[in-house]
A protein has these predicted regions:
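Short, charged/polar low-complexity linear motifs in solvent-exposed/disordered segments
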Residues: 21, 43-45, 80
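Short coil/turn and helix-start
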Residues: 1-8, 19, 33, 37-41, ...
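Hydrophobic face of amphipathic alpha-helices that form TPR/SEL1-like repeat modules
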Residues: 1-3, 26-35, 39, 62-71, ...
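Ser/Thr/Pro-rich low-complexity tandem-repeat tracts
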Residues: 17, 23-25, 53, 89, ...
Length: 108
């Protein structure tokens, strides 16, 4: 399902902005792909855009990227990368990442 006409328009403009290297739009485009908002659900595309957003310094996506690596959503499971992104997110004060980082240390 593509969603409502406003979701399709939002996807269109997020896509334009994301392709011009706007990191928040890259995160939003990843969200659209992850949940099928304005486009077909595609976890590989979601991962790609979340990663671009993180690589461009958008701190709010670090924890999400850690989850994708941990669960193998749109990419191979990579616990070392998951830990790295959880740690970066926690260092930036993300409360959810403190929990995820604690679980990494607890489980090993």
């Amino acid at each position: 399902m593509l969603g409502s006409s406003s979701e399709i328009k939002a996807f269109y403009y997020y896509n334009l902005s994301a392709n011009r290297n706007h990191s928040e739009s890259q995160k939003n485009l990843g969200y659209c792909y992850e949940f099928g908002r304005g486009t077909e659900k595609n976890l590989e595309e979601a991962f790609k855009w979340y990663k671009k957003s993180a690589d461009n310094g958008y701190k709010e996506v670090y924890d999400t990227l850690g989850n994708f690596y941990k669960l193998g959503k749109g990419t191979e499971i990579n616990l070392e990368e998951a830990f790295k992104w959880y740690k970066k997110s926690a260092e930036n004060g993300n409360n959810e990442s403190f929990q995820n980082l604690a679980l990494c240390y607890d489980i090993g």
